[in-house]
Amino acid sequence: MHIFDYDVVVVGAGLAGERAAIEAHRNGANVALISLVQPRQSHSNAAQGGIQCSLDNMGEHSAGDDWKLHFDYTVRGSDWGADQDVVERVTKAAPRIVRELEYWGTPFNRTAEGKIEQRNFGGTTVWRAAFAADFTGHALLYACDQEVMKSGIDIYWRMQVISLILNGDRVIGCIVMDLRSGDLVAFCARSSILATGGAGRIYSESTNAVICRGDGLSIAYNTGLVPLGNMEAIQFHPTGLYPVWILLTEGCRGDGGVLRNKDGHEFMWDYAAKKGNLASRDVVSRSMMSEIRAGRGLEGPFGPHLWLDLTHLGEQKIMSRLRDVHDIARDFAGIDVITQMAPVRPVQHYTMGGIRTDIDARAVGVEGLYAAGECACWDMHGFNRLGGNSLLDTLAAGYYCGSTAAQDAKNRTSQSGDLPAIHSELKKQRGRIEALMSRDPKENAQLIAQEMAEIMTHHVGIFRTGDSLREGIDKLLDLRGRIENVGLKHKKVGRNLELEVALRAPGMIDVALAVAHGAIMRTESRGAHYREDFPKRDDDNWLNRTLAYKQEGDYLPRLDYEKVVITHLPPGDRGYGEKAPPSTTESE
C-alpha cells in the first residue's frame, strides 16, 4: 500500500489544474499534480478561438473597452444566472492574467504596432478575444506546462481518481488507481483541488475529449455533502463539424464566417436582428435547430446539418488565423474550407454547472476541498457561457483556487491522525474492484454508458419538454439499476479499460440524472436551458441556482436552491434582438 502526503493535491492537469498547482507552489505548498493523461494532452489543448480580456488594443473596434463592459456582456450572456461578484473579480483580473501568460511565452497574434491582437466573438460588441491563431488553448497550456516543469511540481499521470477520503466533513485526500499497474494509491492532502474538466461525454454528440466524463463531479457528489450547482445548464456549440463533432471555433464567425441553410441563405439575421451570426451560443444553436426543424437543413447519413461558409475569407486569412480549422475539416471531413462550405450542427460543448464553490473556490459542504475550471460552479457563466470566457475562467479560477488552498493548508495539521479513515477508504475501493472482478458479466458498462449518452442527446438537448425529460429520466434510472449488475470479462487490474469504464459509469449516470432532474424541475427558459413548455424566463420564481445533493437510497438527487448574487446589473433584456423559436412539441 502506497500513501503519499502533500500540502496540496491537484487532480487534473489542464489549464485550471496547472494554474492552481503553480499558484499553490508559489505560496509555499508542497504540491502533487495528478492526471489521467500526459498534461499536454489535456482537453484545454482543444480550445481554439481566444481568451476574453479588456485590453482595448483594436482601435475603433475595441474603443472604450474595460472590465465594466466585459462584466456587462458576461452577465447578459449568462441570462442573469452568473454570480456578479465572481464575474467582477474575473473581468478585473483578465488583463493581468493574459499579460502573465504572454510573459510565460504564449505566442499571441500581434497587431501592426506589436500589441496583442484581439478578435470579435459572440455576445459582445467589441473585439476582446486575445488569440494565438486558432490554437489558443494549445498555446496557453504549453506555456503553463513549462512553468509547472520549472517549478519542480511532482506530476503523476495515467492515474484515475476514484474517490475522495473523508474524515467526518473534512476531505483529507483521494484514492487513485494507477492505470498501468492497477494499484490503489492514497494521496493525502491538507487541501485537495479538483480540476477535472467537464462532463461532455455523458452526451453521444460532444466536442469534448473522451476523458471528459465528469469524474471530479461524480466523486464530489458521491460524498453526499457537496452539491452540484446548475447542472441543467449545458452549452451546445453551434459549429460542431458534422458528423465527427470536433469543434470549429467561434473565431470562424468572429473573423467573418457565416451560417447558411440548404438554400444558401444566411439565416441568423432572421433570428437575432442585432447580432446575427455572433449572437450568444444558446441563441445561435436554437436558431440552427429551428432551421433544421423547418426543413431547411441538408439531410445526411447522420441526420441533418447546415453550412459554415468561410469561402469568402480567402486563403491567406484562413491559413494565418484559422489554420487548425482548415486542417481539421480536411482531415476529418474531407472538406477544403478555402473553397467549400463545412457541414456543421449544434453539439454539446460545455458544462456550465459543476461542483458548487464559494468565490474563493472552496467547495460548499466540506472542509479541505476546492474546485476550479469546468468541473466547478463558482459561478462565472450562469446559464450561457460567452466564447473566450472559458480559458479566462480556467486561469482565473486556478489562480485564486491555488492561492486559497495553499494558504488554508498552512492552518491544517498533518494527516497522521487520519490513518483509520485512509485505510477504511482504501479497503472500500478494493472491495468495489473485487466485486466487479468476481461478478458474472450480466451487463456491459461500456454499452450502458453508450445508452446513457444517446438518452441525454435525445431527451436533454437544446429543446426540452417535461414529457421528454420525464421519459429520459425513467430510462436513466433503469440504466442506473442495471449498472449494479456489471461484471468484468477481463480479470487483470492493470491496463484494463473495461475496469476503468466500470468504475466510472455509475458516476456518469449520476451526473446525467442531476442534469435531467434539474432540467425537469426548472419550469422556465434561461440561457441554454430552453423549455418549450415554459418558453419565457421567470425572474420572479427562478432567479436562483439549482443545488443537487446525492440522496441515500435514491438515484435521483435532492434539489435545493439559492439566490444568484446581483451587485451591479439587474435582470433585463440581453440585447441580441432574439426572436423566439417556432413552437413545437418535437423533442431533440
Summary of predicted features, one role per range:
Residues 12-15:
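Glycine-rich Rossmann-fold phosphate-binding loop(s) that bind the pyrophosphate
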Residues 97, 102-183, 188, 195, ...:
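Conserved redox-cofactor binding core of oxidoreductases
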Residues 191-246, 278, 300, 387-404:
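Glycine-rich loop(s) and the adjacent beta-strand/alpha-helix scaffold that form part
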